[in-house]
Swiss-Prot record:
Main location per the UniProt record: nucleus
Cross-link Glycyl lysine isopeptide (Lys-Gly) (interchain with G-Cter in SUMO2) residue location(s): 19, 152, 314, 374, 382
Compartments (UniProt record): Nucleus; Nucleus speckle; Cytoplasm
Residues the record lists as Phosphothreonine modifications: 163
UniProt source species: Macaca fascicularis (Crab-eating macaque)
Positions where Phosphoserine occurs in the chain: 10, 12
Chain ranges of the Helicase C-terminal domain: 250-411
Protein name: Eukaryotic initiation factor 4A-III
Regulation: The ATPase activity is increased some 4-fold in the presence of RNA.
GO biological process, one term: rRNA processing
Residue positions where N-acetylmethionine is found in the record: 1
Motif extent (Q motif): 38-66
Length: 411
């Protein structure tokens, strides 16, 4: 909300040790007034939404859902620090759906995300969860036809999920009307700032009604995020995971010493049979490297698919569809894939390049062991990467061992 609020000191926050089976070692540092609601049935949700939640396959709310949904529904501004794989997307999606007046065919909630695929996934999740509610939801993203956006928005959408640039463009054109918006959700806010969306987020915010409720989700809370929460939020509730406790639990992490860049390719070829036991994602730091590696793998007769931010939207969507369905098993990608894209079968991640910043590490690796599934992460480490690897270990209080010969047995 528009008035500035200084965040309460952590002295007033209470540490809670969670007792859920797969969250045993995560400590939440959470505002005093946050209660735990152990079931969806006791959250006071509408019947048609509950049906959608259970039809989706959810049984019991995750730790973040048990704490955040009720607070958001109450209308409180909420800062939730939550890593990938904790059920954060469903947290705000369920809350948004609960707060809609379906009779009113105007945009009532706006969700901003850093990547096009993430916005589309949020939109699809909303439509699935809101299946029995007759909800209208549109993904407003760059790389798609502007005319189609205008047509969909004119038709009337209860919720718009999108990337900041295209959303702001639609607001400026007056196609996206903001007068009925009650809630703004900033998903993966840290990554939106990393991608230089800060100005556009502020631009969008200026067009919203002054009493708009703000929900911010972020894996990390750097200074710029806290500055934003001070500007946008009133007395926010905090639901935070202490940084040192962000869990990489259930994910076995290894490194392979490759000495030089040229040796990585042969190492990957040696591992290919292991990759295809399940589904694997291979991360490179640049689009050029993704294209180069994809071509080189195909020349060596290995089947791989690839994806990065320069590809046309349609192409990226069909690649994701193939990968989700299991038709393709090995995907080479940049970090565009690392944020929030949910493919349950992925249990192996390879960092062909170590990520450029340590926050990205948990986003990449967090893909491979979602909701307590076990996963394996393998990091290719050149001589001059050893320092970065040790830094990641220290930052996350974790251990990354040399890859054993029997790695296939661990997947």
């Amino acid at each position: 909300m528009a008035t500035t609020a200084t965040m309460a000191t952590s002295g007033s926050a209470r540490k809670r040790l969670l007792k859920e089976e797969d969250m045993t070692k995560v400590e939440f540092e959470t505002s005093e007034e946050v209660d735990v609601t152990p079931t969806f049935d006791t959250m006071g949700l509408r019947e048609d939404l509950l049906r959608g939640i259970y039809a989706y396959g959810f049984e019991k709310p995750s730790a973040i859902q048990q704490r955040a949904i009720k607070q958001i529904i109450k209308g409180r501004d909420v800062i939730a620090q939550s890593q990938s794989g904790t059920g954060k997307t469903a947290t705000f999606s369920i809350s948004v759906l609960q707060c809609l007046d379906i009779q009113v065919r105007e945009t009532q909630a706006l969700i901003l995300a850093p990547a096009r695929e993430l916005a589309v996934q949020i939109q699809k999740g909303l439509l699935t969860l809101g299946d029995y509610m007759n909800v209208q939801c549109h993904a407003c993203i760059g790389g798609t036809n502007v005319g189609e956006d205008i047509r969909k928005l004119d038709y009337g959408q209860h919720v718009v999920a999108g990337t900041p640039g295209r959303v702001f463009d639609m607001i400026r054109r007056r196609s996206l009307r903001t007068r009925a918006i009650k809630m703004l959700v900033l998903d993966e806010a840290d990554e939106m700032l990393n991608k230089g969306f800060k100005e556009q987020i502020y631009d969008v915010y200026r067009y919203l009604p002054p009493a708009t409720q703000v929900v911010l989700i972020s894996a990390t809370l750097p200074h710029e995020i806290l500055e934003m929460t001070n500007k946008f939020m009133t007395d926010p509730i905090r639901i935070l995971v202490k940084r040192d406790e962000l869990t990489l639990e259930g994910i076995k992490q290894f490194f392979v010493a490759v000495e030089r860049e040229e040796w990585k390719f042969d190492t990957l070829c040696d591992l290919y049979d292991t990759l295809t036991i399940t589904q694997a994602v291979i991360f490179c730091n640049t689009k050029r490297k993704v294209d180069w590696l994809t071509e080189k793998m195909r020349e060596a007769n290995f089947t791989v698919s690839s994806m990065h931010g320069d590809m046309p939207q349609k192409e990226r969507e069909s690649i994701m569809k193939e990968f989700r369905s299991g038709a393709s098993r090995v995907l080479i990608s940049t970090d565009v894939w690392a944020r929030g894209l949910d493919v349950p079968q992925v249990s192996l991640i390879i960092n062909y390049d170590l990520p450029n910043n340590r926050e990205l590490y948990i986003h990449r690796i967090g893909r491979s062991g979602r909701y307590g599934r076990k996963g394996v992460a393998i990091n290719f480490v050149k001589n001059d990467d050893i320092r970065i690897l040790r830094d990641i270990e220290q930052y996350y209080s974790t251990q990354i061992d040399e890859m054993p010969m029997n790695v296939a047995d661990l997947i």
